[in-house]
Amino acid sequence: MPEGKIIKALSGFYYVLDESEDSDKVIQCRGRGIFRKNKITPLVGDYVVYQAENDKEGYLMEIKERTNELIRPPICNVDQAVLVFSAVQPSFSTALLDRFLVLVEANDIQPIICITKMDLIEDQDTEDTIQAYAEDYRNIGYDVYLTSSKDQDSLADIIPHFQDKTTVFAGQSGVGKSSLLNAISPELGLRTNEISEHLGRGKHTTRHVELIHTSGGLVADTPGFSSLEFTDIEEEELGYTFPDIREKSSSCKFRGCLHLKEPKCAVKQAVEDGELKQYRYDHYVEFMTEIKDRKPRY
């Protein structure tokens, strides 16, 4: 039976991109009753086996094992996430970026940081601050790009990342995710709204999750991570989602060190020595407190 990937889910129909070589055929499929019975919901991003009824319609027969699964947005088998943050309007926030990075890392998704609206910076201090932060994150090992959707050349280095990958765009509302995607692939024609001056953040303009062909891969312009809570991350797992902390933690005296009040902690020493940025450690402590204070689930 043929195989494919769900690229859109709408009103009980699943649109499957046929995975045959050089095929761009999309089949409209319904799920089998067995999925409902077993409480399995097909998701955008699922690799599936389907049975074709004709050239345009069919039935989902099997859902392959997922490498990861996001709840909000409901999508799975994501290879990478482009985290879009604006330099200004709204202001750049390392705390919010680190929160997104933790959630992405926890799902084994490769993050790419994109700071947009560089053309809207009006003073040198802000420019210098953004450049310094970009260098900090590059030193951790992240790909960081400074862009403007009006400057096509600033986007050129991002485009090769999309080849043969399933990519999610995420980030603060109002930072220009749709504008950025439209600049990369003008044929998408995604809706963009002006930023809401009153709220200081943009209105969500994306209605549903859909994987769209662009630059040799599949890209989802999602409503973003509408939930930024650490509901599935445990205390001992948090450090692994900070690559810079993870690297230093191997030198801690005690196994299971949470880098809070433990003696001979290599992470705290690295902060003191300037090898680990204070703001990164502060965010780690803030997130750890949040996880510790989380109400138990039964």
Swiss-Prot record:
The modification Phosphothreonine is found at T166. In vitro phosphorylated mostly on Thr (with lower signal on Ser) by PrkC in the presence of poly-L-Lys or myelin basic protein, dephosphorylated by PrpC. Most in vitro phosphorylation occurs on Thr-166, in vivo phosphorylation has not been detected, but it might vary during the cell cycle. Gene3D superfamilies: Nucleic acid-binding proteins, P-loop containing nucleotide triphosphate hydrolases, Probable gtpase engc, domain 3. Pfam families: RsgA_GTPase, RsgA_N. Changing S178A: No GTPase activity. Wild-type phosphorylation by PrkC in vitro. Residues 67-228 form the CP-type G domain. Changing T166D: Higher endogenous GTPase activity, GTPase more stimulated by 70S ribosomes than wild-type, increased association with 30S ribosomal subunit in vitro, wild-type behavior in vivo. GTP binds at T116, K117, M118, D119, G171, Q172, S173, G174, V175, G176, K177, S178, S179. Its EC number is 3.6.1.-. Zn(2+) binds at C252, C257, H259, C265. Its cofactor is Zn(2+). GO terms for cellular component: cytoplasm. Changing T222A: Wild-type phosphorylation by PrkC in vitro. One of its GO terms (molecular function) is rRNA binding. Disruption phenotype: Has been described as essential, but also as non-essential. Cells have a slow growth phenotype. Disrupted strain grows as chains of filaments, a cell curvature phenotype is also present, resulting in long wavy cells or short curved rods. Depleted cells form aberrant, swollen cells. Depleted cells DNA staining shows fragmented and/or disturbed nucleoid segregation; effects are seen most in minimal E-medium. Depleted cells have an irregular deposition of cell wall and 15% have abnormal septal cleavage planes. Keywords: Cytoplasm, GTP-binding, Hydrolase, Metal-binding, Nucleotide-binding, Phosphoprotein, Ribosome biogenesis, RNA-binding, rRNA-binding, Zinc. Belongs to the TRAFAC class YlqF/YawG GTPase family. RsgA subfamily. PANTHER family: SMALL RIBOSOMAL SUBUNIT BIOGENESIS GTPASE RSGA, SMALL RIBOSOMAL SUBUNIT BIOGENESIS GTPASE RSGA 1, MITOCHONDRIAL-RELATED. Monomer, but able to form dimers. Associates with 30S ribosomal subunit; a phospho-mimetic mutation increases association. Probably binds 16S rRNA. This is Small ribosomal subunit biogenesis GTPase RsgA.
